From Swiss-Prot:
<keyword id="KW-0479">Metal-binding</keyword>
<dbReference type="InterPro" id="IPR012337">
    <property type="entry name" value="RNaseH-like_sf"/>
</dbReference>
<protein>
    <recommendedName>
        <fullName>Ribonuclease HIII</fullName>
        <ecNumber>3.1.26.4</ecNumber>
    </recommendedName>
</protein>
<dbReference type="GO" id="GO:0043137">
    <property type="term" value="P:DNA replication, removal of RNA primer"/>
</dbReference>
<dbReference type="GO" id="GO:0004523">
    <property type="term" value="F:RNA-DNA hybrid ribonuclease activity"/>
</dbReference>
<dbReference type="InterPro" id="IPR036397">
    <property type="entry name" value="RNaseH_sf"/>
</dbReference>
<feature type="domain" description="RNase H type-2">
    <location>
        <begin position="85"/>
        <end position="302"/>
    </location>
</feature>
<dbReference type="InterPro" id="IPR001352">
    <property type="entry name" value="RNase_HII/HIII"/>
</dbReference>
<dbReference type="InterPro" id="IPR024568">
    <property type="entry name" value="RNase_HIII_N"/>
</dbReference>
<feature type="binding site">
    <location>
        <position position="91"/>
    </location>
    <ligand>
        <name>a divalent metal cation</name>
    </ligand>
</feature>
<comment type="function">
    <text>Endonuclease that specifically degrades the RNA of RNA-DNA hybrids.</text>
</comment>
<dbReference type="GO" id="GO:0006298">
    <property type="term" value="P:mismatch repair"/>
</dbReference>
<dbReference type="Pfam" id="PF01351">
    <property type="entry name" value="RNase_HII"/>
</dbReference>
<dbReference type="InterPro" id="IPR024567">
    <property type="entry name" value="RNase_HII/HIII_dom"/>
</dbReference>
<dbReference type="InterPro" id="IPR012295">
    <property type="entry name" value="TBP_dom_sf"/>
</dbReference>
<dbReference type="GO" id="GO:0032299">
    <property type="term" value="C:ribonuclease H2 complex"/>
</dbReference>
<dbReference type="InterPro" id="IPR004641">
    <property type="entry name" value="RNase_HIII"/>
</dbReference>
Amino acid sequence: MNTFVLQLDEETIQHLIQTLKEYQVQNANPYIRFAAKFKQATILIYASRKVVFQGKNASAVAQELGYKPVVHKSNQDNIKNKQDCSLIGSDEVGNGSYFGGLAVVASFVKQADHAFLKELGVDDSKNLTDVKIKQIAPLLEAKLPHKALLLSPQKYNEVVGDNKLHNAVSVKVALHNQAIFLLLQEGWQPDKIVIDAFTSPKNYQKYLKNENNRFSNPLTLEERAEGKYLAVAVSSIIARKLFLDNLDELSQKVGFNLPSGAGQQSDKIASQILKTYGELGLETTAKLHFKNTKKAYQLLKKE
């Protein structure tokens, strides 16, 4: 199967979504904001504005839509030659999912850990199944120094939104900074600190000024870092398990199978929760500022 990857600006992505709207398909991956099947190719648009074309006709479809694709290199190729020092890597999971909390993890990885990680098959958690994530995450947690933070939906809704302490970006800055700070406080001394970029360095520094717990170590924000640095991949895997466990726990509490992601299935489940519990049900299970909340109310009115 051929795979091609593009990094597009928001305006171009909106145009592509409009073009492929009638070919849209459901996708449960919380990192994917739009998915479509078009002429024997699958097109995936990630929240990071990465666009992936997959399938036998991936190249032809990409070119037909006006894009010049770049062959996607394997994550192992990306990881190679970037692991010659001790690293703290940080990543978050849940920011693209309507239901569930926001998990942020920072992990410390030494060069001596690489053989263990490669034996486990550690890679970008976006390419691992949930079953695999749940198998290897406990092994990583037991062996590697890390700090894991989970902002529950209820707490998220208290601090994120209009006229509140945080917006969707600043809250991630706060969580990443705190996770890394706590790890450094334990005495771990990395040669480099890398965060999987979710905003520009300038924007990160702007929001960082509001944080009390600061550190002087140099910090790098790098796009798709979870596919380039084992330390970030480790954090991505642990954070994914933390998010999934939280989603399972919330599902049991409300009696509905809460999906990850922010698609139509989330709208439907949200409307059922509204019908059963009122808005309080969403306040404790979902991120209210997502558009899904409005859509859920609209679905409820149609009943």
